[in-house]
């Protein structure tokens, strides 16, 4: 008799994806972040669902409904801060996952990489519309400033902004549609995740060496399930520590002031995970130029597979590329820091230099270093 795990139509899919899946034996802990992202998504959907039961998407009551959740709902504050800090954890895992993909050449699986890019954009959109919902000062002004960037589009810009706003300013219509989008986008993310896994399992996982590992594979369960469980426990521990000891560490104090269209905060800035892109946006003096630089800073990742000039897939044995990769990471950290600083000297200059270096590294320096390495290895 065939094992039900291998014969049942539904169980068979789960079995082939999480139990009997042939996995390279040498994948390191950097490969844990995919499963951690899945865990983050499930946690965000669950906490978000409970928050949506008590939240009211109306300009007059949105802020007070958040206060009500924190004060009157049983463990409402826990759910709220788990959701807010869960988003930070989500982006930490997301950026690490992408960094691993860049370092080890996982982008060679183009379909998986492209679906991953779609996931990145969807998650970023979800986080942005979600940031507007508490209807605090920073929520309101971040929504106003970022959506207003659409007005830089020639000819149709102003019409487009008013269409997104649902009026002549960020108001009730905007809040309602942002809540609707914030509710539906995680489920779109969930669907895209399944497509992402589908494409990944067509080729099998990459590994640190970048060399095909068909000769040396092990079943996913129990080896990698144990490894993933360890990662999951560490993630939950970090999230709980952050939520219970420093829930407002990554938030903005301005969001504890109800939204006021007549009073602009001194420094308008998004959440920390968007600061690198915000710094690139601000470093271009021209509005349209800034918007294009912002878009390109994210969309440039789509072209990474085309910019791969190395004969080797992974950076494991390529010291020049390794040096440039870590320079890129430092550059992104610098941009993140600059994005949170006021627009004044010397931050403006540092931001402009870091922005130039970001594009220079990806478009010119890294492909050139790969070609030099090919020559040195006589390939």
Swiss-Prot record:
Heme b b562 binds at residues 83, 182. Heme b b566 binds at residues 97, 196. InterPro entries: Cyt_b/b6_C, Cyt_b/b6_C_sf, Cyt_b/b6_N, Cytb/b6-like_sf, Cytochrome_b, Cytochrome_b_C_euk/bac, Cytochrome_b_N_euk/bac, Di-haem_cyt_TM. The chain crosses the membrane at residues 33-53, 77-98, 113-133, 178-198, 226-246, 288-308, 320-340, 347-367. Gene3D superfamilies: Cytochrome Bc1 Complex, Chain C (1.20.810.10). Its cofactor is heme b. Binds 2 heme b groups non-covalently. Pfam families: Cytochrom_B_C (PF00032), Cytochrome_B (PF00033). One of its GO terms (molecular function) is metal ion binding. One of its GO terms (biological process) is mitochondrial electron transport, ubiquinol to cytochrome c. It is a multi-pass membrane protein. GO terms for cellular component: mitochondrial inner membrane; respiratory chain complex III. It is found in: Mitochondrion inner membrane. The keyword Transmembrane helix applies. It comes from the Eukaryota. Keywords: Electron transport, Heme, Iron, Membrane, Metal-binding, Mitochondrion, Mitochondrion inner membrane, Respiratory chain, Transmembrane, Transmembrane helix, Transport, Ubiquinone. A ubiquinone binds at residue 201. Belongs to the cytochrome b family. Heme 1 (or BL or b562) is low-potential and absorbs at about 562 nm, and heme 2 (or BH or b566) is high-potential and absorbs at about 566 nm. The cytochrome bc1 complex contains 11 subunits: 3 respiratory subunits (MT-CYB, CYC1 and UQCRFS1), 2 core proteins (UQCRC1 and UQCRC2) and 6 low-molecular weight proteins (UQCRH/QCR6, UQCRB/QCR7, UQCRQ/QCR8, UQCR10/QCR9, UQCR11/QCR10 and a cleavage product of UQCRFS1). This cytochrome bc1 complex then forms a dimer. Component of the ubiquinol-cytochrome c reductase complex (complex III or cytochrome b-c1 complex) that is part of the mitochondrial respiratory chain. The b-c1 complex mediates electron transfer from ubiquinol to cytochrome c. Contributes to the generation of a proton gradient across the mitochondrial membrane that is then used for ATP synthesis. This is Cytochrome b. It comes from Physeter macrocephalus. The lineage of its organism: Eukaryota, Metazoa, Chordata, Craniata, Vertebrata. The gene is MT-CYB.
